[in-house]
């Protein structure tokens, strides 16, 4: 194989490529690099040059040298005695010289020997050739050196240019960094100044608040002092009234001896009893009165009488209270008690009796109330309520809720008047709160709902406005959830609600229409008005909101905008150019045509509506979508319609309540608050609310719990009443229609909108023969309890965009529970429809196969009566059915037992042949009868 390149030829010759290149250059073959290709002519030229330079050109070689090399190994022990292997190389060299066989005669040699002049001429020519070769080599070396020097200079220039460019780049980078540093320092200074200003404002505000708080505390203290002074004055007046002497008319009696009076008086003073004084002592006191000089006697008598009157009041029957109502039997009646304060303690007891006088209260009892709240309403301690309930045989704690009946019984037992509290009206309560706040009404962004038929380009239109790719991410390319977004435009913020267009999502579209200010009705210019377009128009007109029509796909060649306008006019949606009030805009979601004009029309409608809402108020709004997330709990997408929703607010949404733990915007980012017309996701509700429920922010969590409990109870009672009515209706319907097959289903979906849409679509599949029964439908993943319910009800579990957990899958596999997963509502409806079709009883259809005429009748002892027949049309087969006609009247219908021809059993006999036919369990046949043969075929039915 010949070598193709210089490098390969050099390897073959065992030379370096550089040496071979030099030799080729000397031979006049111009090759620059080792990868250049050599041909046979180049090799021949090199060979001729080498032979000429070594003097062997044109002559035979006289001497040849051969070198032989062989290698062998020997083993020899070293000084340590270890054997080592030594390689021995033997080289042999032999030289062979070729000798001439014929030696010419000396005369011939002499004649053939060249002359000295010829030799000199040859030598000079050789010398000239050698000089020319040397000069040529020197010129080539000079040219090569010159090229190398130029290449080296070029590389040096490029290196210098790169170094200069790098230095300039570094200088520019340093200048930019210094500018950025200066800008950052400037921004930091501005920020520090703003922070200092904010701190100063905060300090000033705090000082003002502290001053206001101090003034309020001072006013409160003054008010408290005034109330305390009034209470003390009232108590002093009561005490003075109680201590005032009575006017008593006493008749004169004969005087008694003074010692007796003295003894009576001293005895009275010593005893200090609470009982009335004896008659004798009283007489003595009255007798001693005249002996006293002037008014002194009257004063003593009045004091004694008032003292006895005061003691008498302590013996009156009193109502038991928690105060000391023993009439003076207290610590002062114990031995060793303080003696000097006895009179003061009695005054304190009288004051306490007046202060703790029992008052009958009117206690309003709500649906549920805790023990502590009930005690607070009756102004007593909770332990008294617990004691009363224990007497009634009910063990409770202080925080345990009581029902309304039990609480009213306790109130009556405690001596108060119990009244049923009015039912909580959350809307009125919220309206009362908002009106009490007197919040300022500010302009808000419009809420725009995009509605229309499926695949008319609603989501694609929003994608172009939002510059996102939502439509491609939806399963099946259709929207199955309500999407809420807010978009910032040069003229303000617009909030969009994207509703599904599929017929199953009617409830979602209705919710979107109720929560909106403006409706964008999307209608494809190449498709026209469709059923869901008409439904969207009805929802918008029912909600009373203006309609802006967007004619999508207007850039397609088959678009016919005028035809679509005429169809919409037929649905009472009249464009402005026809004298109506609905602007029509032709748009394209691909090219962006008409998008700006559409937004302009929407904002113009918003300006006409003058949308306003309070900002500094408790938030109110509507729940758009709900779901149950495994890691976050119940999640609700809400649209704030008024007020500001903040993290930490107590939210009441339908039958659920809770404190907002976190808020996320439509991009999944955390946010602290959301104003009017802003959609957010909130977490923290105790359960998953119903989509479409109104939500509101309450100040009191207890109030929110009461309202949610009341709503749940009301909903439960309504649901039970509906179920009972449905059971009665079903019972009467089943009695009238007979046995009806049911297909029990359990539906679990990711969001509530999809769950209710799927349930409604599946219930529509029910027929008179088979009925779809929704055993349970909910939001969240498929749990073990769902599988257990499916086992008990023999239901099929349908998961829409959800999956079963490990325990649920294990339980389902062990009990053969069918769990099916879907992410497109079409597929779920189609498969359930197919399953219902399989449950339908097949349709039996009769198909005629032939006729025969009985020409003779045979009677055999072992077989029975046999009809000798002639097949007039079609054929007769074994085990087919027949119909016996006599005088064109059907006599009997049965089965053919066997068919014989020429004493042989055959499967079938065709037209034009005779055969014997044995009829099963029937022998009453005559000549001339007609037989019709037919088969019953079962055909599968579909819904």
UniProtKB/Swiss-Prot annotation:
Residues 498-501 are annotated as: G3. Residues 552-555 are annotated as: G4. Pfam families: EF-G_D2, GTP_EFTU, IF-2, IF2_assoc, IF2_N. Residues 588-590 are annotated as: G5. CDD domains: IF2_eIF5B, IF2_mtIF2_II, mtIF2_IVc. Keywords: Cytoplasm, GTP-binding, Initiation factor, Nucleotide-binding, Protein biosynthesis. GO terms for cellular component: cytosol. Residues 104-116, 278-293 have a biased composition (Low complexity). GO terms for molecular function: GTP binding; GTPase activity; translation initiation factor activity. GTP binds at residues 452-459, 498-502, 552-555. Residues 443-612 form the tr-type G domain. Residues 452-459 are annotated as: G1. Residues 120-163, 171-229, 313-323 have a biased composition (Basic and acidic residues). InterPro entries: DNA-bd_dom_put_sf, EF-G-like_DII, IF2_assoc_dom_bac, IF2_II, IF2_N, P-loop_NTPase, Small_GTP-bd, T_Tr_GTP-bd_dom. It is found in: Cytoplasm. Residues 477-481 are annotated as: G2. Residues 96-229, 243-352 are annotated as: Disordered. HAMAP family: IF_2_B (MF_00100_B). One of the essential components for the initiation of protein synthesis. Protects formylmethionyl-tRNA from spontaneous hydrolysis and promotes its binding to the 30S ribosomal subunits. Also involved in the hydrolysis of GTP during the formation of the 70S ribosomal complex. Belongs to the TRAFAC class translation factor GTPase superfamily. Classic translation factor GTPase family. IF-2 subfamily. This is Translation initiation factor IF-2. It comes from Acidovorax sp. (strain JS42). The lineage of its organism: Bacteria, Pseudomonadati, Pseudomonadota, Betaproteobacteria, Burkholderiales.
